[in-house]
Amino acid sequence: MATRNRTLLFRKYRNSLRSVRAPMGSSSSSTLTEHNSLTGAKSGLGPVIEMASTSLLNPNRSYAPVSTEDPGNSSRGTITVGLPPDWVDVSEEISVYIQRARTKMAELGKAHAKALMPSFGDGKEDQHQIETLTQEVTFLLKKSEKQLQRLSAAGPSEDSNVRKNVQRSLATDLQNLSMELRKKQSTYLKRLRLQKEDGADLEMNLNGSRYKAEDDDFDDMVFSEHQMSKIKKSEEISIEREKEIQQVVESVSELAQIMKDLSALVIDQGTIVDRIDYNIQNVASTVDDGLKQLQKAERTQRQGGMVMCASVLVILCFIMLVLLILKEILL
């Protein structure tokens, strides 16, 4: 069952409550009202913490209100706090999975280097560690892929563009991580096969020495038995290497399936850049058209009938004023 840690959110609400209640009374009454508001006591003194319909991404977005009802004066000292949408939690969870996968991949690289080093032991512990780390990384990648599909399946909303950008970014990071793991596994597989070929050459040399030693004296039989023990040990190592190679091949196949699923979610960065350039060009052309329309409207306003009428009226008023002055002078 999936759970979410709300300790930080609780502390945020508690600190907000303290800052609001501090100027309203003494420290003792503030502590009492804080306890009553958080525990739901019927005191009527504490404020109500209410999750109202506000958003961190869009102030016009509405969410389901969650409030603690106080039977007393609940309208006094109300604190309004907005909650982010659900897909933000999903994206944060995917980011945590990707970070854990990166850490495990670093440990896996060290385990690969340690397992490929020549040693006198059987290497079962290193192989078990490699197998465990590979399974953990693959599990984290699959879980991230499922959460990413859940994020892409979210319905349309007012912040869908932000959600799509976050989805593309996480999908790109997940694809790069899968490619890196696939490359590590392929390199490890090649080096294992190379060591296997070297072991086969060593076995052939030991077999030749054993056949040659059969014609020697009885004193050389002890050395021949020692060679036989080496051959058996080499055969056991070859069998273990075969198992390791098979496990690596299976993990590479799983990674190939993950890459195939991610290819449907990742959008090429060049396409995004082209889309941005296209939008910028559209904005530039729209601004140019708007400027032309404004200039045309200005010319039309200057040469319109209203301007002509106003000009004629001003001229007539001036003529009438002159005639009035002349009339007064002559009479």
UniProtKB/Swiss-Prot annotation:
<dbReference type="InterPro" id="IPR006012">
    <property type="entry name" value="Syntaxin/epimorphin_CS"/>
</dbReference>
<dbReference type="GO" id="GO:0006896">
    <property type="term" value="P:Golgi to vacuole transport"/>
</dbReference>
<keyword id="KW-1133">Transmembrane helix</keyword>
<keyword id="KW-0333">Golgi apparatus</keyword>
<dbReference type="InterPro" id="IPR010989">
    <property type="entry name" value="SNARE"/>
</dbReference>
<keyword id="KW-0175">Coiled coil</keyword>
<keyword id="KW-0813">Transport</keyword>
<feature type="topological domain" description="Cytoplasmic">
    <location>
        <begin position="1"/>
        <end position="305"/>
    </location>
</feature>
<dbReference type="GO" id="GO:0043001">
    <property type="term" value="P:Golgi to plasma membrane protein transport"/>
</dbReference>
<dbReference type="GO" id="GO:0005802">
    <property type="term" value="C:trans-Golgi network"/>
</dbReference>
<dbReference type="GO" id="GO:0006906">
    <property type="term" value="P:vesicle fusion"/>
</dbReference>
<dbReference type="GO" id="GO:0005484">
    <property type="term" value="F:SNAP receptor activity"/>
</dbReference>
<feature type="region of interest" description="Disordered">
    <location>
        <begin position="20"/>
        <end position="45"/>
    </location>
</feature>
<comment type="subunit">
    <text>Part of the t-SNARE complex.</text>
</comment>
<dbReference type="GO" id="GO:0098629">
    <property type="term" value="P:trans-Golgi network membrane organization"/>
</dbReference>
<dbReference type="GO" id="GO:0005794">
    <property type="term" value="C:Golgi apparatus"/>
</dbReference>
<dbReference type="Pfam" id="PF05739">
    <property type="entry name" value="SNARE"/>
</dbReference>
<feature type="domain" description="t-SNARE coiled-coil homology">
    <location>
        <begin position="235"/>
        <end position="297"/>
    </location>
</feature>
<keyword id="KW-0472">Membrane</keyword>
<dbReference type="GO" id="GO:0050832">
    <property type="term" value="P:defense response to fungus"/>
</dbReference>
<keyword id="KW-0611">Plant defense</keyword>
<dbReference type="InterPro" id="IPR006011">
    <property type="entry name" value="Syntaxin_N"/>
</dbReference>
<comment type="similarity">
    <text>Belongs to the syntaxin family.</text>
</comment>
<feature type="coiled-coil region">
    <location>
        <begin position="124"/>
        <end position="154"/>
    </location>
</feature>
<dbReference type="InterPro" id="IPR000727">
    <property type="entry name" value="T_SNARE_dom"/>
</dbReference>
<dbReference type="GO" id="GO:0006886">
    <property type="term" value="P:intracellular protein transport"/>
</dbReference>
<feature type="topological domain" description="Vesicular">
    <location>
        <begin position="327"/>
        <end position="331"/>
    </location>
</feature>
<dbReference type="GO" id="GO:0016020">
    <property type="term" value="C:membrane"/>
</dbReference>
<dbReference type="GO" id="GO:0005768">
    <property type="term" value="C:endosome"/>
</dbReference>
<dbReference type="GO" id="GO:0009306">
    <property type="term" value="P:protein secretion"/>
</dbReference>
<comment type="function">
    <text>Contributes to the regulation of secretory and vacuolar transport pathways in the post-Golgi network, and to the maintenance of the Golgi apparatus and trans-Golgi network (TGN) morphologies. Vesicle trafficking protein that functions in the secretory pathway and mediates liposome fusion. Required for extracellular resistance responses to a fungal pathogen. Also involved in the protection of chloroplasts from salicylic acid-dependent biotic stress.</text>
</comment>
<feature type="transmembrane region" description="Helical; Anchor for type IV membrane protein">
    <location>
        <begin position="306"/>
        <end position="326"/>
    </location>
</feature>
<dbReference type="GO" id="GO:0009863">
    <property type="term" value="P:salicylic acid mediated signaling pathway"/>
</dbReference>
<dbReference type="InterPro" id="IPR045242">
    <property type="entry name" value="Syntaxin"/>
</dbReference>
<keyword id="KW-0653">Protein transport</keyword>
<dbReference type="GO" id="GO:0007034">
    <property type="term" value="P:vacuolar transport"/>
</dbReference>
<feature type="region of interest" description="Disordered">
    <location>
        <begin position="59"/>
        <end position="80"/>
    </location>
</feature>
<feature type="compositionally biased region" description="Polar residues">
    <location>
        <begin position="31"/>
        <end position="40"/>
    </location>
</feature>
<dbReference type="GO" id="GO:0009658">
    <property type="term" value="P:chloroplast organization"/>
</dbReference>
<protein>
    <recommendedName>
        <fullName>Syntaxin-43</fullName>
    </recommendedName>
</protein>
<keyword id="KW-0812">Transmembrane</keyword>
<dbReference type="GO" id="GO:0007030">
    <property type="term" value="P:Golgi organization"/>
</dbReference>
